[in-house]
Design a protein with these regions (language model features):
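Flexible, acidic/Gly-rich N-terminal and inter-domain linker regions that tether
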Residues: 1-35, 39, 47
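Short linear Ser/Thr-Pro motifs
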Residues: 5, 40-41, 131, 159
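Solvent-exposed, flexible loop/coil residues
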Residues: 6, 43, 61, 69, ...
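A structure-centric signal for secondary-structure junctions around beta-strands
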Residues: 9, 21, 33-34, 46, ...
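Short, small-residue-rich loop/turn micro-motifs
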Residues: 16, 43-45, 160-162
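Short acidic, gly/pro-rich beta-turn/loop elements at beta-sheet edges
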Residues: 22-24, 34-35, 49, 103, ...
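Canonical Radical SAM [4Fe-4S] cluster-binding loop centered on the CxxxCxxC motif
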Residues: 29-72, 76
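Conserved AdoMet/S-adenosylmethionine-binding subsite of the radical SAM
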Residues: 79-205
Length: 205
């Protein structure tokens, strides 16, 4: 299923092999020739952020997407706009669709590695942004955000949405487990390692 808005945004509802569905979105710039693709990384999500469309559909993680399923979203959308032979190009990726990338780190890493590979899709590190609510899990005995600085080495966007702990917990229950103050040192390490600015995501409620 494909939906188009007046501003040129294109939303795809994609069916996977197991008949599950995920969404992918192409967001155009003003010229309508350059697109940012918004990728999903899982079917469902248990984080239950109040403002998230996924949380309105499912408050549980059904399954993570494989690296191939993540990359296939890019290839399908490239085919749709004929990225390969026309002036229209998907120039940027944001992993901000369905699911939390930091809860599917192994598969996200493989997908990003293939995206950056010179024999693959050839996206530079500053053309890819990974979003995180700030899941403070451990990966290979270090904090996941610190691990991602080395293994992903792309832009990081922190899904903050409120700097008031009580309010953030109300709209993002994960804040009860991984507080703002506990995540700031990890985010500083990410910047120190990558020298890439960290984006702050903030929804107007």
């Amino acid at each position: 299923d494909i939906q188009k808005s007046k501003d040129g945004t294109i939303k795809f509802l994609l069916e996977l092999k197991d008949k599950r569905n995920v969404e992918t979105v192409l967001i155009p710039d003003k010229s309508q020739s350059r697109y940012t693709i918004c990728l999903s990384v899982s079917v469902g999500c248990y984080l239950s952020c109040e403002f998230c469309a996924t949380a309105q559909i499912s408050k549980k993680l059904v399954r993570n997407l494989t690296p191939g399923e993540i990359i296939s979203q890019i290839i399908l959308c490239k085919d749709y706009i004929d990225d390969w032979s026309t002036q229209k190009k998907i120039t940027n990726q944001v992993l901000m669709g369905e699911g939390s990338p930091f809860l599917n780190l192994d598969n996200v890493k493989v997908a990003i590695d293939n995206s950056k590979n010179k024999d693959g899709l050839e996206y530079g590190r500053t053309r890819i942004t990974v979003s995180t609510v700030g899941v403070g899990i451990k990966k290979d005995n270090i904090d996941a955000i610190e691990w991602a600085a080395k293994e992903l080495d792309v832009y990081l966007a922190w899904s903050l949405h409120s700097s008031i702990p009580k309010h953030r917990s109300e709209i993002m229950p994960i804040n009860e487990k991984y507080s703002i103050n506990s995540l700031i040192p990890q985010l500083k390490k990410y910047y120190e390692k990558t020298k890439l600015p960290i984006f702050i995501e903030w929804i107007c409620l």
